[in-house]
Design a protein with these regions (language model features):
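Conserved ATP/PPi-binding loop(s) of AMP-dependent carboxylate-activating enzymes
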Residues: 381-385, 394-429, 468-470
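Conserved AMP-binding A3 loop
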Residues: 39-41, 191, 200-227
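Conserved AMP-binding/adenylation subdomain of ANL enzymes
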Residues: 223-247, 255-296, 310-311
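AMP-binding/adenylate-forming catalytic core of the ANL superfamily
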Residues: 96, 113, 297, 410, ...
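Conserved AMP-binding/adenylate-forming
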Residues: 36-38, 50-96, 251, 469, ...
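Gly/Ser/Thr-rich phosphate-binding loop
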Residues: 295-299, 308-375, 387
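Conserved pre-ATP/AMP-binding loop-to-beta segment of ANL
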Residues: 27, 156-204, 211, 236-247
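AMP-binding/adenylate-forming catalytic domain of the ANL superfamily
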Residues: 529-553
Length: 560
């Protein structure tokens, strides 16, 4: 682990940071969830019983546990319970389809998983798996508001849920907690893991190719990333992180490093309450910002575009706003300008920030300066304890004053891709200075005088749709299962930040004369049934053959 300077104690596990805050803020709010307030004491009880319940079901230190749920109290509690006993939280998109869930389970060798109402069916038939079902409405308030919210939610998910049959064991959240309570009552000890350098989480990402990889992140790396935000607040804005007056909007999904470390774990480390949203809703998020005085707000560009367009934040007091910004996708400069105007009109003393990062370094490694307007195209300066350089692509040769592949050296770097040393070696590269640098696969330009980094283009064949990573190889593999399709290729088209997927299809000879409009509909329907909605192509074009390079690879440049 890289040595670095910070006044915060990052040499602890994630659970130990949770326990520290719970001890200091016992009866204060920890989560806001659909107008329900869950205190630190209540959250700690959930974590402790969940940890005991897992032990009762055979989960042990070092085991990988799948967490396939959105931002809800059970999901957050499960993450820290897994960490408490030294197991590893393997985060999975809550709307993953069966093939994606099977891939993730097989990749990490998981035997225990958490899911929610809608994702349960994806685990059907995994007969070695113990599955814990978490109901989205479990912690809705016991009030008329909560009753109505529950009824509306039931209506919303009607027809979208199905039980996961043929698993080893299928229990609900409350039953797991009951088993945990019995385990403790029987006199069993609950061992607490204490190694800050142990892997805490595995995040799914594209790595350097279109195939999902499991990024291993240790406790200390995650802690360091979270405290970087506090360093920005204290050393740049000359303010303090104050749990008495601060609050975080946790609308960014925690299955991604951005929501996991910059929203969820920042709140845990600082003791500030966080407002949880399992699904983004512009109106509900805006109402929570007003109600709870939320002054740490992060979201993908689409979030802010919708909130701004609807006018939900217009005219509210933002004089206590500390940090507000976007990442997870390209941030249009027009959005930055609009949000800066809104912040100024509402009395904020900070500017809208843009961030850049990769799961391979937990998430954000650069921020624009919240004290000034960001130059167009700028993705910020390196965060505290982060070094950046550009190199000639495919080499370790530094280039200055010109575009090059961005490389990062920081205490937030991953341990490597899970069980994939070859791919790890491609991105974690030792340079002549003796340091191991992360090669990002992104072309950037670094302004030498200011340190500002300017994003140019992405080298990796991975696309972001509404902030979510989609993997072309997965999509192509799925569509090749259709009898009508001989071969296919996916590319991204459109402006940065508004990427759409286009599928090129080579038809099987048997179906060469079929009506193409009917076949397009069939392809879309197949995608809706077998892929996540972000992976379904918006544009379909039929061609006679895929263009190839001289060595036989598909020529993506020709297709583009």
């Amino acid at each position: 682990m890289i040595e670095y300077t910070t006044r915060y104690d990052v040499k602890k596990t994630m659970y130990e940071k949770f326990a520290d805050s719970a001890a200091q803020h016992t009866n204060e709010p920890c989560f806001y969830y659909y107008n329900n307030t869950i205190t630190w004491a209540q959250a700690e009880k959930m974590v402790d019983l969940c940890a005991a319940g897992m032990l009762a079901n055979g989960v042990r230190k070092g085991d990988r546990v799948i967490i396939c749920a959105p931002n809800m109290p059970q999901c957050i509690a499960a993450i820290y319970a897994v960490n408490k006993i030294g197991a590893i939280a393997s985060m999975l998109h809550p709307l993953s389809v069966a093939s994606e869930a099977q891939y993730a389970v097989d990749l990490v060798g998981a035997k225990f998983a958490f899911c929610f109402d809608v994702s349960e069916k994806a685990f059907k038939g995994m007969n070695h798996l113990t599955l814990v079902r978490c109901k989205t409405a479990e912690y809705f308030p016991k009030t008329p508001y909560g009753f109505i919210a529950n009824q509306l939610y039931k209506k919303k998910i009607k027809g979208k849920t199905a039980p996961a049959t043929d698993v080893k064991k299928n229990i609900d959240w409350k039953e797991l907690l009951r088993e945990g309570k019995e385990y403790i009552a029987a006199g069993n000890e609950i061992p607490i893991a204490e190694n800050p350098l142990a892997v805490a989480a595995i995040m799914m990402t594209g790595g350097t190719t279109g195939n999902p990889k499991g990024v291993q992140l240790c406790n200390e790396a995650i802690n360091n990333l979270s405290y970087q935000l506090c360093d920005v607040v204290e050393n740049v804005l000359d303010m303090k992180c104050d749990p008495k007056s601060d609050a975080m909007l946790t609308a960014l999904p925690v299955f991604h490093g951005f929501g996991f470390a910059l929203c969820m774990h920042v709140s845990i480390c600082t003791g500030m309450p966080q407002s949880l949203f399992p699904q983004f809703d512009a109106k509900m998020c805006s109402d929570a910002i007003k109600k709870y005085g939320i002054n740490y707000i992060f979201g993908v560009p689409d979030f802010f575009e919708k909130v701004y367009k609807a006018g939900y934040l217009k005219g509210i007091d933002m004089s206590n706003m500390k940090l507000i910004g976007s990442g997870g996708d390209v941030v249009p400069y027009s959005l930055t300008e609009k949000m800066d105007r809104l912040l100024k009109e509402n009395g904020a003393h900070c500017h809208f920030v843009s961030g850049y990062g990769l799961t391979e370094c937990v998430t954000v490694c650069s921020f624009t300066d919240p004290r000034r307007e960001a130059p167009q195209g700028c993705i910020g300066v390196p965060c505290y304890n982060v070094e950046a350089m550009t190199v000639k692509p495919g080499t370790t040769d530094e280039v200055k004053g010109e575009d090059g592949e961005l490389c990062i050296y920081a205490p937030t770097l991953m341990e490597g891709y899970y069980h994939d040393p070859d791919e790890t070696a491609k991105v974690l590269v030792k340079h002549n200075d003796g340091k191991v640098w992360l090669h990002t696969g992104d072309m950037c330009y670094i302004e030498q005088e200011t340190g500002d980094i300017y994003y140019r283009q992405r080298l990796k064949r991975v696309y972001k749709i509404s902030g979510y990573l989609v993997y072309p190889s997965f999509i192509e593999e799925a569509y090749r299962a259709m009898a009508e399709i001989y071969d296919c290729c996916v590319i991204g088209v459109g402006e940065e930040g508004q990427t759409k997927l286009k599928l090129f299809v080579v038809k099987n000879k048997k179906f060469k004369n079929d009506d193409e409009e009917m076949l397009k509909k069939k392809i879309i329907e197949f995608g809706m049934q077998n892929l996540s909605k972000w992976s379904v192509p918006k544009i379909i074009e039929f061609i006679d053959a895929l263009p190839r390079t001289k060595i036989g690879k598909v020529d993506f440049k020709v297709l583009k």
